[in-house]
């Protein structure tokens, strides 16, 4: 723990009131780390900690997540230069898991996290852990073997700890990290959900979202989805590939750029480049520049109600629940696009705006908090409850959740800026967001309205 932020004792105190997730950054190490300093100083035992490659090596087949050099030159203590593997940037140096010393050192880090009380272990950028020049160097068999090792160690040392893989890749590759349903991750990030919800909102058409959601399948009852809409990174576009045509992906990128979003690009093996990430707060991603605050909030609540209605475990990014807007000043000051959604606040700033019931922060925080509180009390929203998806025309998404005890929740979402009337849906129950009783076969939803109907 960085001394300026606290100590392990502070972490132990947090554990008393919350389940802790530790970010196990297993693919790479900071260029400012002690391990890398020892490597540069040529200290015995660190010779093979990082991956030195002849710059003449053909690495054209390697999957590149960013439009940056794969190899970065560094000067060692004796004056020699090594070109080291840097998948993401020159300040993140990839670890050499082919070295037994690295594997042992990283297992030691994992064991330390478990000892400090981690309930969840997030494996960061895990898909790139093993490198073989001439291959894509992503999703290799050896990488899956490493995850299986981490899972076996975790199960033996701290049974019940959940491993979550963070792989911002096309959906079919993402779900491979469940393994056989028992031997790799218990949860995977649901990376396709954030851009598909944006696609549905901006097109006012739920069909693609509904079709994809209806196809979701888990390999075992011991696995589930880690659902989210926003994070400290941008909104990944690779998870859309294979779900939407490339033309629709590029159309979404263009639309979001017009509304103020920034774009990060990746290099392709054929020399071209493609957009891989949209940088924007989710509040601004959902809205138009000229949207009223009321419409902005309504779209935002709709999207998060979808998140909270999906099978799996929902996660809400702090910038989202605080109703953050794009931080262009942060981008200019720090020099990278992801800063747009990483604004830092003082407690006083947040308190002032959350105590002003006319502020957009207050309205988003209070309404989203209410949704979360309602969800917690409903057994139909258990991660393992049955989920049935249906598109009613283009504009209405219907999700039915059925609990093990038979309780049913019907969620209706109007993905349009016009009132929509739903016919032929025989529903009897209570709408939980308004408290109104529902009966009959005809329902009218306002623009961007959500209904959670607990059936009698």
Predicted regions located by residue number:
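Active-site and adjacent substrate-binding regions of carbohydrate-active enzymes
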Residues: 1-426, 434-456
């Amino acid at each position: 723990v960085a001394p300026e932020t606290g100590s392990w004792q502070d972490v132990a105190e947090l554990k008393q009131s919350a389940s802790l997730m530790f970010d196990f950054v297993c693919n790479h190490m900071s260029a400012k780390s002690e391990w890398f300093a020892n490597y540069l100083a040529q200290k015995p035992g660190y010779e093979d900690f990082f991956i030195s490659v002849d710059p003449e090596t053909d690495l054209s087949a390697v999957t590149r997540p960013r439009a940056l050099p794969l190899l970065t030159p560094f000067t060692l203590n004796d004056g020699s230069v090594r070109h080291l593997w840097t998948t993401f940037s020159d300040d993140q140096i990839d670890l050499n898991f082919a070295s037994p010393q690295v594997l042992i050192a990283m297992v030691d880090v994992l064991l330390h996290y478990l000892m400090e009380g981690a309930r969840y272990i997030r494996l960061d950028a895990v898909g790139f852990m093993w490198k073989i020049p001439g291959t894509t160097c992503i999703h290799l068999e050896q990488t899956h073997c490493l995850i299986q090792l981490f899972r076996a160690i975790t199960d033996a040392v701290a049974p019940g700890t959940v491993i979550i893989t963070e792989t911002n890749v096309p959906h079919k590759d993402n779900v491979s990290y469940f393994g056989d349903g028992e031997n790799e991750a218990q949860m995977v990030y649901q990376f396709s959900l954030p851009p598909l919800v944006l696609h549905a909102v901006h097109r006012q058409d739920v069909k693609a979202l509904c079709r994809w959601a209806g196809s979701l399948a888990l390999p075992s009852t011991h696995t589930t989805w880690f659902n989210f809409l926003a994070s400290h990174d941008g909104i990944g576009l690779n998870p859309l590939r294979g779900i939407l045509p490339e033309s629709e992906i590029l159309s979404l990128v263009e639309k979001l750029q017009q509304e103020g979003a920034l774009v990060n690009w990746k290099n392709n093996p054929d020399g071209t480049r493609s957009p891989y990430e949209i940088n924007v707060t989710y509040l601004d991603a959902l809205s138009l520049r000229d949207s009223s605050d009321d419409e902005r909030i309504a779209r935002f609540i709709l999207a998060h109600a979808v998140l909270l209605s999906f099978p799996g475990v929902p996660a809400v990014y702090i910038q989202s629940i605080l109703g953050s807007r794009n931080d262009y000043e942060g981008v200019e000051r720090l020099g990278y696009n992801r800063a747009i959604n990483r604004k830092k606040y003082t407690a006083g700033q947040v308190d002032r705006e959350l105590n002003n019931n006319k502020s957009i922060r207050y309205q988003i925080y209070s309404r989203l908090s209410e949704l979360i509180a309602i969800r917690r009390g409903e057994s139909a929203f258990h991660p393992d409850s049955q989920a049935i998806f249906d598109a009613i025309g283009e504009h209405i998404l219907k999700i039915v959740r059925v609990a093990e005890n038979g309780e049913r929740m019907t969620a209706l979402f109007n993905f349009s800026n016009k009132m929509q009337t739903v016919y032929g849906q025989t529903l009897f129950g209570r709408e939980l967001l308004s408290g109104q009783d529902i009966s009959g076969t005809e329902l009218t939803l306002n623009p961007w309205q959500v209904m959670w109907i607990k059936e009698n």
